[in-house]
Amino acid sequence: MKYKMLMLYCLLQIISMSALAQDHLNIKSIFDKYGKQEGSVLVQLSSDILSQGSNITFYKSLIMSNDVAKERDVLNLLKLDIDKNVIVSEVKKNGKVESGTYYVGKDKSGKTGEYILYKNKPDKITIVYLKGNFPPARLDSELKKLKDLFIYVNDKRLKIQ
């Protein structure tokens, strides 16, 4: 009985830690608002998949159709989150952010770095939130590891791109 209670407690801790990820960031409302809309693709990778050779501990992405209201909404909240933090890279065209990689600091535990990736194409907007135990200088190498990660679904190999 004690073993079952201990396992239940551990499971609840893991669930609550995942639920708290990105709660303090403004960009969270974008995932909540647009993540379940028709045509949007929301992906969250579990830690058991991410632990295969990567230091990324949490991954959540949203791909949604692009329109002026969504773009304005995303950029306003993104500016609030990256204020006084590190811009790892940013590409602007005609004064408009087309893509960006941002380090938004450590999470509440103070151990894990948080990152937001943003890409704006004419037909879609992509936002990625991730956490990991690595400095901003190693983000590119961690993303390459993630890109090479294979997910097996119904005995088929799907490569993340």
Q: For the regions a protein language model found, what residue spans apply to each?
A:
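Early exported N-terminus immediately downstream of N-terminal targeting peptides
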Residues: H24-L78
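Extracytoplasmic
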Residues: S40, S46, D83, K96-V97, ...
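Amphipathic, non-transmembrane alpha-helical stretches in extra-cytosolic proteins
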Residues: K79-I82, V86, I125, I151-V153, ...
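C-terminal partner/receptor-binding element of secreted or periplasmic proteins
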Residues: G132-Q161
